[in-house]
Amino acid sequence: MSATLNVLRWSALGAGVVYGFVHNRTLYSQAEKKVADAKFKKQEKLIEQAKAEWARLHPAPVASTGVVTDISDDKFDIEAYLNHAFPEKA
C-alpha cells in the first residue's frame, strides 16, 4: 500500500474517533440537562403543593368589619380598604 493511502486511512480513523468523542459528550450533556430540568420541575411542583397546603391550613384573617386587608387576596378591594383605613371625618 502506498503511504498516501495509509495516511488517509489513519486520518479518517482519527477523525472518526474525535467525532465520536465529541458526539458522545454532546449526548451526555443533553441527558444530564434533561435530568436536571426534571429534578427542578419536581421541586417546583413540591413547592407549589406546599404553598397550597400552607394556604389551606392558614387562611388569611378577615377583619371584623368585613374588609380584606391582605393585598394578595383575590377579594381585596382597594377602595374598601382605604375607606376603612382612613375614614372620612365630617
Swiss-Prot record:
GO terms for molecular function: proton transmembrane transporter activity. Coiled coil: none annotated. Its main location: mitochondrion. It is a single-pass membrane protein. One of its GO terms (biological process) is proton motive force-driven ATP synthesis. The keyword DNA-binding does not apply. The chain crosses the membrane at residues 7-23. It is found in: Mitochondrion inner membrane. The keyword Lipoprotein does not apply. The modification N-acetylserine is found at S2. Keywords: Acetylation, ATP synthesis, CF(0), Hydrogen ion transport, Ion transport, Membrane, Mitochondrion, Mitochondrion inner membrane, Transmembrane, Transmembrane helix, Transport. GO terms for cellular component: mitochondrial inner membrane; proton-transporting ATP synthase complex. InterPro entries: ATP_synth_F0_esu_mt. Mitochondrial membrane ATP synthase (F(1)F(0) ATP synthase or Complex V) produces ATP from ADP in the presence of a proton gradient across the membrane which is generated by electron transport complexes of the respiratory chain. F-type ATP synthases consist of two structural domains, F(1) - containing the extramembraneous catalytic core, and F(0) - containing the membrane proton channel, linked together by a central stalk and a peripheral stalk. Belongs to the ATPase e subunit family. F-type ATP synthases have 2 components, the catalytic core F(1) and the membrane-embedded component F(0), linked together by a central stalk and a peripheral stalk. The central stalk, also called rotor shaft, is often seen as part of F(1). The peripheral stalk is seen as part of F(0). F(0) contains the membrane channel next to the rotor. F-type ATP synthases form dimers but each monomer functions independently in ATP generation. This is ATP synthase subunit e, mitochondrial. It comes from Yarrowia lipolytica (strain CLIB 122 / E 150) (Yeast). The gene is TIM11.
